C-alpha cells in the first residue's frame, strides 16, 4: 500500500475511532500495523525536517502517524510482556522493540542497549546510538550517534537528532498524554544537561547546549540576554541556555511580587563549551 493511501486509511479510521476495538480486523488493523512497522524501522517518522529549511517552521509533522500510534491502543488487548526482573512479566498493550530478537537482530540494528533500558515497539533507534538504562516510548526517533543516558526518558513520538547527548534523568516530553499537537524535537549536535525537561512540542535548535536543570515548555519565555528578544517554544541554533527568573509584578499592597521562571540564552556555543559537551567517540565503537 502506498503511503498516501495508508495515510487516508489511518485518517478515516481515526475519525471513526469510537467504533474501533480489539476485535476490529481487516484494512484498519493491517494499516495501523504497517504504520507501526514503518515507524519502528525508521522508514517513516512522525516529524521530518524539510531540506534547506530553518527555524521553528522547518519541521513537517505527519499527524496521521501519531494517529496510527493512538489507534493501536484501541486495537490491542493487554497481554504479558516478558523480561521482567527475576523472571517476572509486565501487563501492557505495547510489546518491547526487542521481543524475539536474537544476537543477529541486535548486531544488524547496530546500536547498544545496556541492560534495563526499555524501548517500546514502533520507536526507531539508529545505528551508533547508546541506550543506558533509559526509556524510549513508542513512535520516537533517535538518530545516529546519540546517547540516551541513565534514567533519561524520550517521550512518545519525540525526535532526537544525530550526535545528541541526553544526560542523566533528562525528560523529553511526549505527545499522547496530555495530547499535544506537535512532538518535542531536539535537533542534531545538542547537549541536554542532567535533569532538564523539554516538553510540549518545544524545538531545541541544532548545536545548542541546555544546562543542568532547565525546564522548557511551550509557554516558557526563553530570553536572549544579548538582544532582549523573547522566544517561545523554540531555542535558536547554537544557544547556551540556563535557568533564570523574570522580576514579578508588584502585589496589590505595592510590595515586590514573586519572580517568574524563565530560560535564558547566555551566549552562543563556543570552543570552550564544545570541549565540555562533545561526543566521546570511544563510547560509540
UniProtKB/Swiss-Prot annotation:
Question: Which SUPFAM superfamilies does this one have?
Answer: Trimeric LpxA-like enzymes
Biological-process GO terms, alphabetical: diaminopimelate biosynthetic process; lysine biosynthetic process via diaminopimelate
What InterPro entries does the database record attribute to this sequence? Answer: DapD_Trfase_Hexpep_rpt_fam, Hexapep, Hexapep_transf_CS, THP_succinylTrfase_dom1, THP_succinylTrfase_N_sf, Trimer_LpxA-like_sf
Q: Keywords in UniProt for this one?
A: Acyltransferase, Amino-acid biosynthesis, Cytoplasm, Diaminopimelate biosynthesis, Lysine biosynthesis, Repeat, Transferase
Instruction: List the molecular function annotations (GO) for this entry.
Output: 2,3,4,5-tetrahydropyridine-2,6-dicarboxylate N-succinyltransferase activity; nucleotidyltransferase activity
Kindly give the PROSITE patterns that the UniProt entry links to this protein: HEXAPEP_TRANSFERASES
Indicate the principal place this protein occupies in or around the cell.
cytoplasm
Which species is this record about?
Beijerinckia indica subsp. indica (strain ATCC 9039 / DSM 1715 / NCIMB 8712)
> Which gene specifies this protein's sequence?
dapD
Q: Which CDD domains match?
A: LbH_THP_succinylT
Q: Where in the cell is it found?
A: Cytoplasm
Put simply, this protein is called: 2,3,4,5-tetrahydropyridine-2,6-dicarboxylate N-succinyltransferase
Entries under HAMAP family matching the protein: DapD (MF_00811)
> Which top EC class applies here?
transferase
Amino acid at each position: 500500500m502506498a503511503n498516501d493511501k495508508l495515510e487516508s486509511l489511518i485518517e478515516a479510521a481515526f475519525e471513526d475511532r469510537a467504533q474501533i476495538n480489539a476485535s476490529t480486523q481487516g484494512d484498519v488493523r493491517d494499516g495501523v500495523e504497517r504504520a507501526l512497522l514503518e515507524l519502528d524501522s525508521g522508514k517513516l517518522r512522525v516529524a521530518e525536517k524539510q531540506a534547506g529549511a530553518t527555524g521553528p517552521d522547518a519541521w513537517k509533522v505527519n499527524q496521521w502517524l501519531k494517529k496510527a500510534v493512538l489507534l493501536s491502543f484501541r486495537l490491542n488487548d493487554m497481554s504479558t510482556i516478558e523480561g521482567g526482573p527475576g523472571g517476572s512479566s509486565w501487563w501492557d498493550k505495547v510489546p518491547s522493540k526487542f521481543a524475539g530478537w536474537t544476537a543477529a537482530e541486535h548486531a544488524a540494528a547496530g546500536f547498544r542497549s545496556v541492560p534495563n533500558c526499555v524501548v517500546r515497539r514502533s520507536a526507531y533507534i539508529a545505528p551508533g546510538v547508546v541506550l543506558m538504562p533509559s526509556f524510549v516510548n513508542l513512535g520516537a526517533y533517535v538518530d545516529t550517534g546519540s546517547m540516551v543516558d541513565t534514567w533519561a526518558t524520550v517521550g512518545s513520538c519525540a525526535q532526537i537528532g544525530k550526535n545528541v547527548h541526553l544526560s542523566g534523568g533528562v525528560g523529553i516530553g511526549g505527545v499522547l498524554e496530555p495530547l499535544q499537537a506537535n512532538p518535542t524535537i531536539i535537533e542534531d549536535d545538542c547537549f541536554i544537561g542532567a535533569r532538564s525537561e523539554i516538553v510540549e512540542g518545544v524545538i531545541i535548535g541544532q548545536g545548542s547546549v541546555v544546562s543542568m536543570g532547565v525546564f522548557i515548555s511551550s509557554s516558557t519565555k526563553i530570553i536572549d540576554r544579548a538582544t532582549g528578544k523573547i522566544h517561545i517554544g523554540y531555542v535558536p541554533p547554537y544557544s547556551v541556555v540556563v535557568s533564570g527568573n523574570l522580576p514579578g509584578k508588584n502585589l496589590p499592597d505595592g510590595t515586590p511580587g514573586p519572580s517568574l521562571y524563565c530560560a535564558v540564552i547566555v551566549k552562543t556555543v563556543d570552543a570552550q563549551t564544545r570541549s565540555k559537551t562533545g561526543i566521546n567517540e570511544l563510547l560509540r565503537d
